[in-house]
Amino acid sequence: TRNTGSARGCLKVEIIEGRDLDVASQTLSHPYAVLQFEKNEYIGKHVSKAAVGSNPAWNETAAFDVTMENRSLHLSVYDRIGDTEELIGACEIFPRLFHQSTTKRWYTLYLLKEDAEEQVKRGEVHIQTTYERLPLRKLSPRDFELLKLIGRGTFGRVFQVRKKDTKRIYA
């Protein structure tokens, strides 16, 4: 599959909750999720009383442009206590990229032990993915919100912009 440069669709990922996460402290740990899809990243930094301990409730949503087929979504969950962060575990998700398809399920997090080649189960995360195919069209300046001027030169001006539908920031 080749990259056409324009979005074929939009993948919405809801990070609902975690279950039995292997955290360092039930009262001090603030686990959060990081999603990576097609070189774009979402870092869940939502801190609430419900996102503490081994069974956090996040209820966060990220949106990604889909430009290529057969891409995986990488999920990592980290344990934050104060200024320290440690990887709890990760998994690879292969979302269904069919128009108006929604999948809601629990995904198991694994961590590779340093001294062995075995993966250790480190908890589960409840994820919902929804895919919407977009009509084929070229992006225009109206699809973006100007944030600030970054640079100026013989090449023209470079702006920092936010894509209106996914809220992603680009330069």
What are the language-model segments listed below?
Residues 8-54, 81:
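Calcium-regulated, polybasic anionic-phospholipid
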Residues 56-66:
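Exposed aromatic-hydrophobic patches
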Residues 157-171:
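Glycine-rich ATP phosphate-binding loop
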Residues 22-26, 43-47, 73-76, 84-87, ...:
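Intrinsically disordered, low-complexity regions enriched in proline, serine, glycine
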Residues 68-135:
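C2-type phospholipid-binding modules
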Residues 146-158:
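Protein kinase glycine-rich loop
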Residues 1-8, 14, 117-119:
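Long, low-complexity intrinsically disordered regulatory regions
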Residues 131-146:
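A short, low-complexity linker immediately N-terminal to eukaryotic Hanks-type protein kinase catalytic domains
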